[in-house]
Curated annotation (Swiss-Prot):
<dbReference type="InterPro" id="IPR013033">
    <property type="entry name" value="MinC"/>
</dbReference>
<comment type="subunit">
    <text>Interacts with MinD and FtsZ.</text>
</comment>
<dbReference type="Pfam" id="PF03775">
    <property type="entry name" value="MinC_C"/>
</dbReference>
<comment type="similarity">
    <text>Belongs to the MinC family.</text>
</comment>
<dbReference type="InterPro" id="IPR005526">
    <property type="entry name" value="Septum_form_inhib_MinC_C"/>
</dbReference>
<comment type="function">
    <text>Cell division inhibitor that blocks the formation of polar Z ring septums. Rapidly oscillates between the poles of the cell to destabilize FtsZ filaments that have formed before they mature into polar Z rings. Prevents FtsZ polymerization.</text>
</comment>
<dbReference type="GO" id="GO:1901891">
    <property type="term" value="P:regulation of cell septum assembly"/>
</dbReference>
<keyword id="KW-0717">Septation</keyword>
<dbReference type="InterPro" id="IPR007874">
    <property type="entry name" value="MinC_N"/>
</dbReference>
<dbReference type="GO" id="GO:0051302">
    <property type="term" value="P:regulation of cell division"/>
</dbReference>
<dbReference type="GO" id="GO:0000917">
    <property type="term" value="P:division septum assembly"/>
</dbReference>
<dbReference type="InterPro" id="IPR036145">
    <property type="entry name" value="MinC_C_sf"/>
</dbReference>
<protein>
    <recommendedName>
        <fullName>Probable septum site-determining protein MinC</fullName>
    </recommendedName>
</protein>
<keyword id="KW-0132">Cell division</keyword>
<dbReference type="InterPro" id="IPR016098">
    <property type="entry name" value="CAP/MinC_C"/>
</dbReference>
<dbReference type="Pfam" id="PF05209">
    <property type="entry name" value="MinC_N"/>
</dbReference>
<dbReference type="GO" id="GO:0000902">
    <property type="term" value="P:cell morphogenesis"/>
</dbReference>
Amino acid sequence: MADIRITGRMVNFSRITFDTNDHDVIRQQLSNILNEGSYQGTVVIIDSTVEQELIALIQLLVSMGLQPMAVIDGILGDEARAIQFPVLPADQPLQRIKPTAEQVAIVEKPTSAQASVETKKPLNNNAVAHITSYHDEILRTGQSLVQDQGDIILKAGMNSGSEVIASGNIHIYGTVRGRVIAGAGGHAAARIFCQSLEAELVSIAGTYCVADDIPKHVVKKPVHIYLNEKQELEFEALEL
């Protein structure tokens, strides 16, 4: 029997992009973010648009309960290699597009049981905006559709090399061949629904699964994807 085994490639991770190298500012802003979600112990990938003292930044993240795993190649690449810290290839640039339409609802914060209602009144301290983005056309290769305040509904499919990201749920009425990322920001109750699953990657709240690991019985089938009690991705074939 071999002494080495390679198993599934699903893991919880988040990507953090830094636009400042002021560690006091980073600590303050990260503290606010971490207090809003269940990020304790999360594996993180570091990206930066400015020069950083990488070792000090890694130590800062560890002190805040995060687990730095790698950096994105670019400004930090050479410094990371010098200390033998993992470097991941930089992303290919995507064109962020606007949805065909958006619907805004005012909802109570999660602590309230009140239903969402649409209103034109200003937000109060107990309410937040929930936005649903609708897109009528196929998402083409190199395009990205992002909604960081709610859900996304694609009325057509998406090509390989495209990407859809939502803080909430994602519904795709067509074939999925790109990357589908729901629950961005740590919303573990988010779900993904699609008519035909051929995705390059699916992710909910940082737990992801690449194409090779998607269960064969749901490939090219209507699928409901969610996180179970163990925070593992579940793929449920749907009968339409």
